[in-house]
Amino acid sequence: MSAIKSIATVLAAILPSVLAQANTSYADYNTEANPDLTPQSVATIDLSFPDCDNGPLSKTIVCDTLTSPYDRAAALISLFTLEELVNATGNTSPGVPRLGLPPYQVWNEALHGLDRAYFTDEGQFSWSTSFPMPILTMSALNRTLINQVASIISTQGRAFSNAGRYGLDVYSPNINSFRHPVWGRGQETPGEDAYCLSSAYAYEYITGIQGGVDPKSLKLVATAKHYAGYDIENWDGHSRLGNDMNITQQDLSEYYTPQFLVAARDAKVRSVMCSYNAVNGVPSCANSFFLQTLLRDTFGFVEDGYISSDCDSAYNVFNPHEYAANVSSAAADSIRAGTDIDCGTTYQYYFDEAVDQNLLSRADIERGVIRLYSNLMRLGYFDGNSSAYRNLTWNDVVTTNSWNISYEVEGTVLLKNDGTLPLSESIRSIALVGPWMNVSTQLQGNYFGPAPYLISPLDAFRDSHLDVNYAFGTNISSNSTDGFSKALSAAKKSDAIIFAGGIDNSLEAETLDRMNITWPGKQLELIDQLSQLGKPLIVLQMGGGQVDSSLLKSNKNVNSLIWGGYPGQSGGQALLDIITGKRAPAGRLVVTQYPAEYATQFPATDMSLRPHGNNPGQTYMWYTGTPVYEFGHGLFYTTFRVSHARAVKIKPTYNIQDLLAQPHPGYIHVEQMPFLNFTVDITNTGKASSDYTAMLFANTTAGPAPYPKKWLVGFDRLPTLGPSTSKLMTIPVTINSMARTDELGNRVLYPGKYELALNNERSVVLPLSLTGKPAVLSKWPLEEQLIPLAKS
């Protein structure tokens, strides 16, 4: 949809709500997954800052930096007429010219780099760093890396903002967990583990974007999305805009919300986005249990933090959810339930009518707009050139650090290797085959802007010491074999073969789920023919979601298999360096690679994690089948010896009541505190230098059945260990990480026998016992709606 370049045109686009309400011809959003946004929602506007030195507000407390951000915002909003107030409730706000308040855009994207920024065609501000997609970043198991990436994105965002090319709020991160492998947006997430990985990613990304934990001066405002129970786009015709997800209290507490708890309570995120879908009959953006009882009252979301709708989801409360009788009622229901700002124009078009019908009051509208502007106060939006971060410029975008971090080889996962990798120095010529070999923007996944450069695998290998024979071979989804002969010819005259394929955003994307998890098109057929040539064969499996690579795993002539995700602007160079041994792989899968039949065994809309009926269980915690590659799988180029650290003594038994009676300075709740440190000695016993990564799992039969196979309680990454060198790795284990979730959604610590085991190989196992009485660590609140539906 083309953007409107004038705020005057934006205002002219607002139709009388009575005429719009009378139109009863609606899109079928039960099947259509892409909302039809109005031009105003996606408009390009002139971004600038208020003048608190000489402007109309300069003598008011709005410009008084000694007054609290909330009071300054409240003073500003008190000056608005009702029309001006309503105009401020959408993502695109025209501002208030008579007060010197410029237009503002809430909707900016920063998933793995800047998107929706106003880029120039060339020169300054024509690009920003494009990092790998989050699922690949999380596979590195490096919390520091996540924070560094977010901090660089935030710095670049502020530099663009200072130049009038970006807002100060970003609709990132996506912290939904990758529950089902067909989901098109799993690539945007930290993987399938909610309690540990998604929560850790949320904390590091949010604090990197915002400039710390609840800093006095915010760098940017992060938005934790999509709250909650959102992980389907259009599977089998089930549109995300109309899905009503049936989720038990147990699964809501255990899987669909713990990352939002960490985002709100620990990272102090300033914004949360409610999702398109309904949960248990109530659309998320009109769900006062979600938005007030759970998020604010239970999770501790900051009082002046604001909740934004997903784009047009306030409208979806009416169509297709039919939770409200009409659009004005949907708007009233959403804001009264706690959705402060509407990404879209439903609030702006229908609030006047809702006020006239006594469906809501001015105070209901003010509450959300004050929260938005309170954050802008914390961002220094009103404070002139002396405010924090206002000095950032294009020079801060063009930094060596951003180049180095964007070359993110750490997440690459070695799935299979018979010793072929790293390539022997005797290999002088290489055949490069496949649809992922000569790519450009495919490297970036989705939600991306212009990058300074895009290095494809073909580019990188052509710049290496190797002689390259390139052939396209076949497309991602093509059923043609026309390119096979050229691919085989290139392979026959080469010392080794690399095939790069898998899936891309033509098959997995926002609004697009897969119906299967097989390798698409004729790719496997071509790989099989290449494998019969008697040459070393390396396969690069690319894309965010997994495909069933069992045939490649079992084929002895496929020597090595690498998962490379969406590796960003330097992706080809990173893959080259892994293959040639300049860098060693140490990433681990943060999802399960299931066999192909998993995708058709049960509906992807079945949100139950535990096995039942045809559902064999979801995620590594509950899946009862045999995966192709397990969650946490990842090989190295070297070998490691892992043993208990002898100097660290760990008690074999802990009393539950004693643990909970401890003082807990620095922690809001005692259960957040580590009660032991799992410390191991890691020795590189091989010949190659390498990082080392580890996941620590717990398991038990304490508490009620059914029991999870295991669950993740911690992870870590050690930087490079040279041959014969050793380092200690310590993974703290918190009290809460050992708890289970009962059917009511309560987190309960049960007495019984437990094990802590390092990695899937269980290379070090620590048995321990908890004694005493079961203890409820946190109680799940009663699920009820606080706000009666609007009647019109």
Curated annotation (Swiss-Prot):
Family: Belongs to the glycosyl hydrolase 3 family.
Name of the protein described by the UniProt record: Probable exo-1,4-beta-xylosidase xlnD
Function, in words: Xylan 1,4-beta-xylosidase involved in the hydrolysis of xylan, a major structural heterogeneous polysaccharide found in plant biomass representing the second most abundant polysaccharide in the biosphere, after cellulose.
Positions of transmembrane segments: none
Domain of life, source organism: Eukaryota
Active site: 310
UniProt GO MF annotations: alpha-L-arabinofuranosidase activity; xylan 1,4-beta-xylosidase activity
Compartment annotation: Secreted
Keyword match Transit peptide: no
Organism: Aspergillus clavatus (strain ATCC 1007 / CBS 513.65 / DSM 816 / NCTC 3887 / NRRL 1 / QM 1276 / 107)
Signal peptide (from-to): 1-20
Sorted UniProt keywords: Carbohydrate metabolism, Glycoprotein, Glycosidase, Hydrolase, Polysaccharide degradation, Secreted, Signal, Xylan degradation
Pathway: Glycan degradation; xylan degradation
Reactions listed under catalytic activity: Hydrolysis of (1->4)-beta-D-xylans, to remove successive D-xylose residues from the non-reducing termini
Pfam families according to UniProt: Fn3-like, Glyco_hydro_3, Glyco_hydro_3_C
GO BP terms: arabinan catabolic process; xylan catabolic process
GO CC, any one term: extracellular region
EC numbers: 3.2.1.37
Coiled coil: none
PANTHER family xref list: EXO-1,4-BETA-XYLOSIDASE XLND, SUGAR HYDROLASE-RELATED
Gene name of this polypeptide: xlnD
Glycosites: 23, 87, 142, 246, 326, 385, 391, 404, 438, 475, 479, 516, 677, 699
